[in-house]
Amino acid sequence: HRTLKAGKLDNLDFAKVTRETYGLSGVEYVNQFFKDKAKGMAYLKDMKQRADDHGVTSVLIMCDGEGNLGDADTKKRMQAVENHRKWVDAAKFLGCHSIRVNAAGQGTAEEVAKAATEGLAKLSEYGKTQGMNVIVENHGGHSSNGEWLANVIKNTGMENCGTLPDFGNFCITREEGNWSNCLEEYDRYQGVKDLMPYAKAVSAKAN
């Protein structure tokens, strides 16, 4: 992502570099690198063709910046659901099996869990009509509590709503202004154990 952010790599060349430089056969896209192209069919066709030309499978799209699916404000939460629908459509066109979303929101663990369960269920209902999974990564805050996130996913009651366990992202609270200083961390081994039963992809890390 640093290469993409630095402008040294165009999103359209991602599949080519993945295959030719690293010898890999699958890619996970980040929506931030084609933020205004979710409904741009010419662009999406180009992305799909380039992946196909290099024998690369489009696996999923990681979606950020589209609102909080765990927002306590119903109107804002439903707007977030609506904002994500276009990425479900784009992912389906590209041949992905999932979109990765965040279960973020403000409030107590119980308040955010209730809101996130509703928001994820609503988005997953739409995802189901498109044959698309909606998966949540442990991505800071309440979502980095494995038990909390597993219960949210379970309570949606949707088979296509799952997790994307990140093996190294179980920091619940960080020092303000210092991303590297974790103040509260969930046990990563327990967290992986909590989340794997609902996993439809993983973000594996090793030292």
Task: For the regions a language model picked out, list residue spans one by one.
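N-terminal pre-domain/capping segments
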Residues: 1-94, 98, 110-114, 118-121, ...
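Flexible glycine/acidic-rich beta-alpha junction loops that bind and position SAM and/or redox cofactors
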Residues: 2, 107, 168, 172-178
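Residue-level signal for the nucleotide or nucleotide-sugar donor/cofactor binding architecture
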Residues: 6-9, 144, 183, 190
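Structural motif
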Residues: 61, 102, 137-139
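Glycine-/small-residue-rich active-site loops that bind phosphorylated ligands and cofactors
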Residues: 107-108, 141
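Basic- and aromatic-lined ligand-binding clefts that recognize polyanionic substrates
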Residues: 127-160, 167, 172
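Extracellular glycoside hydrolase catalytic/binding regions
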Residues: 152, 171-189, 201, 205
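Structural alpha-helical scaffold elements that stabilize or flank donor/cofactor-binding regions
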Residues: 191-195
